[in-house]
Amino acid sequence: MDIHQILIKYWGHTEFRPLQEDIITNVLEGKDTLALLPTGGGKSICFQVPALAKEGICVVISPLIALMKDQVENLLKRNIKAAAIFSGMTHREIDITLDNCVYGNYKFLYVSPERIETDLFKARLEKMNVNLFAIDESHCISQWGYDFRPSYLNIAKLREYKPDVPFLALTATAT
């Protein structure tokens, strides 16, 4: 399916909003991209559509459990396979979720910046067919990365595991 067919099938829209198609095209061309769109501007579609257009899984780094759960719920309502790993899950639940990602049972995996630093995640990441790293609310890198959540500064280390996978940073509030 091309990106327009994906947009119609899963979201019921016939046209992209301004800049969405340009961002999606950049991602599909394998380019690292910064998407600066207003709140309500459809940032999620900018990583969801290209991830659905390609083989593999999109790893989404998100700052808040509530955001992860909301995104996963919205994808599941559209019959798109997605999962999130967050604090409070048992080791077994995390292990099963990551295995399902390795075996191609999900198109989207939502994780926190802290999760990507764990040995278990790194080991499974090497085995995943990742098609995109999406950093949602990427302004948190500079706002929180230097003191409150230093794990944000280590997101770039994912490049060591998947050097050919593009990164898409999304925000409404970059300054």
Ranges and model annotations:
Residues H4, C58-V60, I65-T118:
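Conserved nucleic-acid-binding Ia/Ib motif block in the N-terminal RecA-like helicase ATPase lobe
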Residues G30-V49, V59-S62, L168-A174:
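Walker A/P-loop
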Residues M1-P38:
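Conserved pre-motif I regulatory segment
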Residues A51-A53, L75-K77, D99-G104, A123-M128, ...:
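Conserved catalytic network of the ASCE P-loop NTPase/AAA+ motor domain
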Residues E126-T175:
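Post-DEXD/H (motif II) to motif III coupling segment of the RecA-like Helicase ATP-binding lobe
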Residues G41, Q48, M89-L132, C140-Y146:
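Conserved helix/coil segment N-terminal to the catalytic DExD/H
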